Structures are given as C-alpha cells and as structure tokens.
C-alpha cells in the first residue's frame, strides 16, 4: 500500500530538514575532532609528542566512543531522513533523540576528562570497577550513563520509525516486502527499498539496544552496589 509522503512547499520530501542538517553538521565536527585525537595518539606512539599514559588512554577512550557514536548518529539520521520521505514522522522524536545523544556525549566527556575514566573498549562488567586507582567509581557510572542516554535516544527513534512503517504497510511483514517476496503480493505494491532497509534495521537495532541497555544498567548497579554481581 502507498504511504503518505510529507513534502515541503517546494514539493521536495524533506521532513525536519533543519534537524537533519544540524545533526550531520555536528557529526562532521565530531569526526574531524576524532581525526585530531587519532593523529595525536599516533604522534605520541611515534615519540613526537610526550603524552602521559593516563592522558593517552583518556584520548583513546574518547576516540573510540566518538568514532562509533558518529557512525551511529549519521546512519540513524540518514535512515530517518529517507524514511520520512515515505511516512510522516514526528519531529519531536528526532529532537529528543538528538538531545539525548548530546546529553550522553556531555556525560562521556565529563567522565573521561574530568573523572579520568580511561577504560577504552573495556567498559563492561567488571572492568569499570577495577581502575587501579586511575578513576573513581562515579566516573565509570557517568560514562555508562552517557551510553545509556544515547541508547534511549536511539530506541525512541527506532520505535517511531517502526510504528509508522508498520501502520503504513499493514505490519512488519508488509514493511519487509515479504508478501511480494513469497509470491502473495503484487510487485507494484512492494514498499520502497528505503522502507525495507529501515524496517530491518529497526528490528535488529531495537533488540540490540534493549540488550545493551540491560548490560549497562547492570554494570551501573554493580558500581553503585559492589555486592551486586552481574
């Protein structure tokens, strides 16, 4: 079935164009900053810069989080934009997604450069609590809260996309073009490729976000209540 397409006065389908442009600009700035971080670490490894080991690993932690975060942010924004050309999405959901993402970034940067958190990729239980005195538990908690805030934002975005696609194409199978794929529907009734991709991404990402959030919350509880074992 055909879904409603939202268009601007000029006739071009551009839902929340301003929000999308702002997000892509922010992602570009962060990506450039991560390149600077990467170059700084390489110069330190080559002996050109003299960085204290704790600062090196703080930069490494920020670099890893920033690169993954930038990839996720741009990917979700692009998916939102092209999905919005086929179904009317609620602009407030995207702003909530962006706000939670930025809040998470603030938490993560504060945990790293104010709290000294330098766990890099080893931020899951039980490693955040085993710092060797390099950072306090609150820094690890703040870091994990940052990831949790970002995850909640992504979950809101995916739920909005999934809700609208399911409603427009009569269910998950319809949005995935299964009736057409299995010979029960007409090719002309198949959803656009962007819709199929968005529905598939929404399913897998939603599952991953929920599981990941559960692990993060369990780790936070362990940091606050050490007797609690995950």
Question: What residue spans do the PLM features occupy?
Answer:
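Hydrophobic alpha-helical transmembrane segments of multi-pass integral membrane proteins
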Residues: 1-230
């Amino acid at each position: 079935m055909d879904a409603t397409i939202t268009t601007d006065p000029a006739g071009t389908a551009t839902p929340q164009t301003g929000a999308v442009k702002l997000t892509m600009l922010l992602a570009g700035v962060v990506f450039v900053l991560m390149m600077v971080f990467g170059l700084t670490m390489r110069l330190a490894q080559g002996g050109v810069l003299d960085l204290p080991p704790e600062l090196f690993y703080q930069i490494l932690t920020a670099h890893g989080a920033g690169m993954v975060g930038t990839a996720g942010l741009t990917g979700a924004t692009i998916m939102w934009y092209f999905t919005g050309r086929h179904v009317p999405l609620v602009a407030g959901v995207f702003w909530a997604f962006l706000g939670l993402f930025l809040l998470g970034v603030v938490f993560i940067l504060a945990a790293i450069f104010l709290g000294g958190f330098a766990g890099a990729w080893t931020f899951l239980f039980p490693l955040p609590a085993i710092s060797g005195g390099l950072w306090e538990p609150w820094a690890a908690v703040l870091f994990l809260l940052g990831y949790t805030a970002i995850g909640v934002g992504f979950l809101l975005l995916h739920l909005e996309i999934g809700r609208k696609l399911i409603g427009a194409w009569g269910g998950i199978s319809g949005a995935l073009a299964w009736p057409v794929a299995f010979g029960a529907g007409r090719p002309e009734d198949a959803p656009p490729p962007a819709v199929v991709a968005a529905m598939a991404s929404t399913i897998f990402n939603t599952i991953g976000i929920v599981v990941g959030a559960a692990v993060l919350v369990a780790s936070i509880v362990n940091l606050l209540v050490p007797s609690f074992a995950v």
